[in-house]
Amino acid sequence: MVIKAQSPAGFAEEYIIESIWNNRFPPGTILPAERELSELIGVTRTTLREVLQRLARDGWLTIQHGKPTKVNNFWETSGLNILETLARLDHESVPQLIDNLLSVRTNISTIFIRTAFRQHPDKAQEVLATANEVADHADAFAELDYNIFRGLAFASGNPIYGLILNGMKGLYTRIGRHYFANPEARSLALGFYHKLSALCSEGAHDQVYETVRRYGHESGEIWHRMQKNLPGDLAIQGR
């Protein structure tokens, strides 16, 4: 186990998460007693307590007052906030994780973009207009792309879509910085944003689904060609 945390709390958090991932602390079992675990990791019990509370909030553990702390099946109990952690834990599975993430984005955006155009076209156009002033480099496009999808999610009037995008932000923007380093990807995205703007202006809500699906397919093809050069820094760094 190689841990690169920058603080005792960060080290303890990574130690426990990696132990759960590697089945040293399997789901459904209980953690060692607090004193034993603090000595094992090499941190104070106060630090360990804070870490356990944070991991419980993220769904890794269930703290049962008066009972031992239980290890959860994190796939069933955690939220989107652990995406970056999963990418760090299993780099070989990152391409599949990203494919799943982008598939979810495409599927839900066909719904919330169409709703935004129907119910709040002025807000949607305001969001899409930000594409007219983007600088032609990867970081700017990564930020723009995330903000456009997130902005349209909130423009739909259903904030839950926006919260889903919030949960994707960390890994999503890391992917974007790599993906948008490709000029072809930037060109395709601009064409997509402008097409959406035209559909919104025309009230052509029925064309949103096919437009978004086509963009998902075409951008996916570019992404798959780039995956062989996937950088290792897509995963979150130690604390």
Swiss-Prot record:
Protein residues bound to CoA: 99, 103-107, 213, 219
UniProt xrefs under HAMAP family: HTH_FadR
Effect of residue 9 to V: Dominant negative to wild-type, decreased DNA-binding
Encoding gene per record: fadR
Family matches, as Pfam families: FadR_C, GntR
Function: Multifunctional regulator of fatty acid metabolism. Represses transcription of at least eight genes required for fatty acid transport and beta-oxidation including fadA, fadB, fadD, fadL and fadE. Activates transcription of at least three genes required for unsaturated fatty acid biosynthesis: fabA, fabB and iclR, the gene encoding the transcriptional regulator of the aceBAK operon encoding the glyoxylate shunt enzymes.
DNA-binding region residue numbers: 34-69
Induction conditions: By growth in the presence of long chain fatty acids (C14-C18).
Region feature Binds acyl-CoA, mapped onto this chain: 215-230
Recorded consequence of changing residue 215 to A: Loss of FadR repression
Major localization listed first in the record, in broad terms: cytoplasm
Effect recorded for residue 218 to A: Reduced ability to repress
Organism: Escherichia coli (strain K12)
Domain HTH gntR-type, residue spans: 6-74
Name by which UniProt lists this protein: Fatty acid metabolism regulator protein
Gene Ontology terms for molecular function: DNA binding; DNA-binding transcription factor activity; fatty-acyl-CoA binding; protein homodimerization activity
Keyword Lipid metabolism among record annotations: yes
Domain notes: The N-terminus binds DNA, the C-terminus (residues 83-239) is responsible for dimerization. The C-terminal domain binds acyl-CoA.
One Gene Ontology CC term in the entry: cytosol
Stored CDD domains: WHTH_GntR
PANTHER family, per the entry: FATTY ACID METABOLISM REGULATOR PROTEIN, TRANSCRIPTIONAL REGULATOR, GNTR FAMILY
Compartments, record wording: Cytoplasm
Activity control: Binding of FadR to DNA is specifically inhibited by long chain acyl-CoA compounds, but not by long chain fatty acids. Long chain acyl-CoA binds directly to the protein preventing it from binding DNA, which derepresses genes for beta-oxidation and prevents activation of genes for unsaturated fatty acid biosynthesis.
Effect of residue 216 to A: Super-repressor, non-inducible phenotype, cells cannot use long chain fatty acids as carbon source
Disruption phenotype: Decreased transcription of fabA, low to no change in levels of fabB. Up-regulation of genes involved in beta-oxidation (fatty acid degradation, at least fadA, fadB, fadE, fadH, fadI and fadJ). Increased levels of fatty acids; double fadR-fabR deletions have the same phenotype, suggesting a functional fadR gene is required for fabR function.
Subunit organization: Homodimer. Binding of acyl-CoA alters conformation of the dimer, separating the DNA-binding regions and disrupting DNA-binding.
One example of a Gene Ontology biological process annotation: positive regulation of fatty acid biosynthetic process
